[in-house]
Amino acid sequence: MNFVIPSFIPAIPEIVLLTLTSLLLIADTIWSKRSEFATYYATQLILLVVGYLVLTSFSTSQVLTFDGSFVRDAFGDILKLVIVVVSMGIFLFSKEYLLQNKFYRGEYFTLGLFGVLGMFVMVSAYNLITMYLGLEIMSLALYAMVAMRKDNQHALEAAMKYFVLGALATGMLLYGFSMIYGATGSIQFDEMAQIIASGNVDNVVLSFGVVFIVIGLAFKLGAVPFHMWVPDVYHGAPTAVTLYIGTAPKIAAFAMLYRILVEGLPGLVEDWQSLIVMISVLSLIVGAVITLVQENLKRLLAYSGIGHIGFILLGIIAANPDGYSAAMFYTIVYSITALAGFGMIVALARTNNEFDLVADFKGMNKRNPWLALMMLFIMFSMAGIPPFVGFYAKVVVIEEVVQAGFTWLAVLAVVMAVISAFYYLRVVKVMYFDEPEDNTKIEPVSSQLNWAVSFVSIALLLLGLMPSSLITLCYNSL
């Protein structure tokens, strides 16, 4: 048996990220005594370096390494760059929140970097084992981050629920993986697709495997009926952690969905398509209806996020390259919009007020007109109101669903989008037309956070004015 040394070049960003994060974990014990910001700045520098490595080695063709278990392609590189940008925004927003709430720790940043590493591995995984490895790296980091606030009973409860349900979902995924492996005799996505296409497989075992895999994927995405953890974890976790969970991991979960179903199981499209139709419909309805009664903004964004996941799944249902690129575009747009939404809450939060209730935004236009305008941009984009980019994200997905012959599904999506616009516009109404409960001004937001919120919010408008470039980029990557 000949041992061939694999090419490490396609995985250089991941290797550098793992090495620097491990070194940072050790260095943090020294830095924490000298400079409380050293770990933060080192984290941002590491992300810049990794982003630069991805950008300079951008792959326009598919490159496999590590015996075909790791793939480097344009699809993966684009998602990795978005993960890097979103993660830098997360850490920028989180720094002051952690300081004000007296649990600024280097572990938040190192765990966050390990989470990014897991996302990178998931995005580039090309077999079932590598995908599981990336998923566990990301998940373990997230469990620990949710439980970081040891003195907060709600955070500990959220962490326990997240861990138990996460373990259950992982078990479902592994059971599905074992069935697919048992039926095909391979864990490589391309080989699985070829074997299934040949027809020499047990379709019953494959069908059961697909069911368990889709259930596991639905949990990771937070789709109905496997969404039980989403509102409680979003609400119970510290807002800085909610900001992390609600943004970048969604990109990795979408990549996981695409790699397994589209690249690994295209021959079973009729099986997984019908399941995803059901999950998407439930997510759209639950996400729109239950959000109507939410008064806590974090829970509101959690339930509305479930509705957005329903839209992402619509693109997958189309089962063609245009549909997949529309879903990819929606995922990127949603992650940026969620970053802006949760970032606004983090920026306004204070030690004695988390600023996470809709009522907290009453009369915000009188207390801080600029931030009220930025919040309006965020809410309009989430609602899908032109000319913001959220509108075009919904349009391209609905268009592809109609082209694929699911007109009834497109009509349902439009109706749910109209219903969901109500609770986003309610926040705008509260800011501009309700009187503040007290006449005190909102405590000044630091210039750094002010610029960050403004940049991300205005980006939602600018991307909406020229969406074709990002849509084309997504299409060409597949």
Swiss-Prot record:
Stored Pfam families: Proton_antipo_M (PF00361)
Is Cell membrane set as a keyword in this record?
A: yes
Q: Which GO terms describe its biological process?
A: ATP synthesis coupled electron transport
List the membrane topology term(s): Multi-pass membrane protein
Task: From the record, give the transmembrane residue ranges.
Answer: 7-27, 46-66, 74-94, 109-129, 163-183, 204-224, 237-257, 273-293, 300-320, 328-348, 371-391, 405-425, 451-471
* Key words of the record: Cell inner membrane, Cell membrane, Membrane, NAD, Quinone, Translocase, Transmembrane, Transmembrane helix, Transport, Ubiquinone
The EC number on file is 7.1.1.-
Protein name as it appears in the record = NADH-quinone oxidoreductase subunit N
Instruction: List the source organism.
Output: Hydrogenovibrio crunogenus (strain DSM 25203 / XCL-2) (Thiomicrospira crunogena)
Q: Which gene encodes it?
A: nuoN
